[in-house]
């Protein structure tokens, strides 16, 4: 009986190993030789930063703990990512750290202090961590960004005292309100929050990441993939010239999201973005979306060639840095989406990593 049990146990273990092996191997694949490419390799601007979307708006949570996050930071480091950006430290009632102020306002207590975790992992892997400000949701409800200033006055102070003074990896601030056009209260709100971020932290840099109101700027919850009324390059330039003129003293960089315009429009909009940033002494980044806006199911990892076209346009237009939204869901070998690990491999092939 004992021999039979041992035999069955060994058989079951062997079967489990056979099933698990392809899954585990897929997380550690070796990219194919770059010689298989029929386009010039490494012609795009490499991605050196990523958002961390742990207070998710419309993407499923992966429910990672410290071990999974540690592994993901290592995957990021292996392809040259040196900047990680918490996209928001809270959204409505869900928060990433035990904020005394926000808890008193009725927010829910988080089970883990993610800001501390991200700062520690950034320190471990030689990266810089940027803190995304709190999003109360009132701007999305009203269209008036000035509502976001009040809560963030307290959040900025809290975060700096808890993490900024503690970790050398704390490297900057992301002013998380997203706009695309002239928006009520936006200029003054960006100025106010940017100024406070700089004052409490001794001048650490700040950035914003707006979207371009192009043909793909549609409601994420809707079924439409495009719209007829899209901003022209000329109108985009006029409106963002006014915005940059009002915020450039306290906002150091602008990373326009690149997924709302078509691929044959990239150079026209990107060149305007770079011209405006240079005019006002700001850095011009691209937020290279690694999810696909062209698919009827929202959202899956992007086709590699679409990402390549966007990164190549950013390099042609002289952009300063490429960040992405976002590595962990759409590009990581351990993402819940199988396609993400394949995108990681194609990216490594293209850049010879």
How would you describe each model-predicted region?
Residues 1, 23-43:
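C-terminal segment of N-terminal export signals and the immediately downstream linker at the start
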Residues 35-353:
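Glycan-processing catalytic domains of CAZymes
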């Amino acid at each position: 009986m004992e021999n039979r049990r041992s035999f069955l146990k060994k058989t079951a273990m062997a079967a489990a190993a056979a099933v698990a092996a392809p899954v585990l191997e897929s997380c550690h694949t070796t990219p194919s030789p770059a010689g298989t490419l029929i386009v010039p390799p490494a012609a795009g601007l490499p991605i050196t930063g990523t958002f961390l979307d742990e207070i998710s708006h419309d993407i499923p949570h992966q429910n990672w703990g410290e071990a999974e996050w540690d592994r993901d930071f290592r995957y990021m480091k292996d392809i040259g990512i040196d900047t990680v950006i918490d996209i928001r430290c809270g959204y409505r009632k869900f928060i990433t750290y035990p904020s005394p102020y926000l808890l008193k306002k009725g927010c829910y207590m988080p089970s883990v202090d993610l800001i501390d975790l991200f700062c520690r992992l950034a320190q471990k892997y030689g990266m810089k961590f940027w803190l995304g400000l709190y999003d109360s949701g009132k701007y999305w409800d009203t269209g008036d960004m000035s509502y976001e200033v009040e809560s963030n006055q307290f959040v900025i102070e809290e975060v700096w005292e808890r993490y900024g003074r503690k970790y050398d990896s704390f490297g900057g601030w992301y002013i998380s309100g997203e706009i695309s056009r002239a928006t009520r209260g936006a200029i003054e709100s960006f100025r106010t929050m940017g100024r406070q971020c700089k004052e409490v932290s001794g001048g650490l840099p700040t950035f914003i990441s707006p979207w371009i109101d192009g043909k793909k700027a549609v409601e994420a919850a809707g079924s439409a993939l495009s719209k007829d009324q899209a901003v022209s390059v000329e109108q985009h330039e006029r409106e963002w010239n006014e915005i940059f003129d009002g915020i450039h003293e306290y906002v150091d960089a602008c990373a326009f999201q690149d997924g709302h315009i078509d691929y044959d429009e990239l150079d026209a909009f990107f060149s305007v973005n770079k011209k405006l940033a240079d005019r006002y002494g700001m850095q011009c980044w691209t937020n290279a979306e690694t999810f696909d806006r062209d698919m009827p199911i929202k959202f899956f990892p992007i086709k590699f060639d679409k990402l390549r076209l966007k990164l190549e346009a950013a390099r042609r237009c002289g952009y300063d840095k490429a960040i992405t939204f976002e590595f962990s869901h759409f590009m990581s070998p351990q993402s819940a989406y199988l396609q993400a690990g394949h995108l990681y491999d194609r990216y490594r092939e293209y850049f010879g990593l």
